[in-house]
């Protein structure tokens, strides 16, 4: 089976794990959040991985960096939603801390990738 370039990126692999963790965790959210925070968290988390993947299909570094920036913006959205979910008691502190650490790792990786793509 053919492997695509995005699959080889450590940041995409780390985000893939993050997506699975968020999906697992949000299964325990209250039913009334199914179309609120659950939907938003899942969509934003998937958006991180999707924009990393889409960016690898672009020909110029500038275009690639644009999609990495969008992925980073989606990550900031996820971090905000995790904070709110923790504040509302939907996520235990331990789970929040673990997700926050992974998000920070992904943030650093995205920044490094964006700097590389921008020639910096």
Language-model features: locations:
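Amphipathic alpha-helical assembly/interaction segments
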Residues: 1-120
């Amino acid at each position: 089976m053919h492997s695509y370039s995005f699959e080889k990126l450590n940041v995409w692999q780390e985000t893939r794990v993050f997506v699975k963790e968020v999906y697992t965790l949000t299964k325990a959210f209250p039913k009334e959040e199914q179309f609120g925070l659950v939907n938003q968290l899942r969509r934003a988390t998937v958006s991180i991985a999707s924009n990393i993947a889409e960016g690898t299909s672009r020909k110029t570094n500038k275009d690639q960096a644009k999609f990495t920036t969008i992925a980073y913006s989606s990550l900031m959205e996820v971090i905000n939603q995790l904070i709110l979910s923790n504040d509302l008691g939907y996520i235990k502190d331990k789970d929040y801390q673990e997700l926050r650490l992974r998000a920070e790792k992904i943030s650093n990786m995205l920044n490094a990738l964006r700097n590389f793509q921008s020639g910096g």
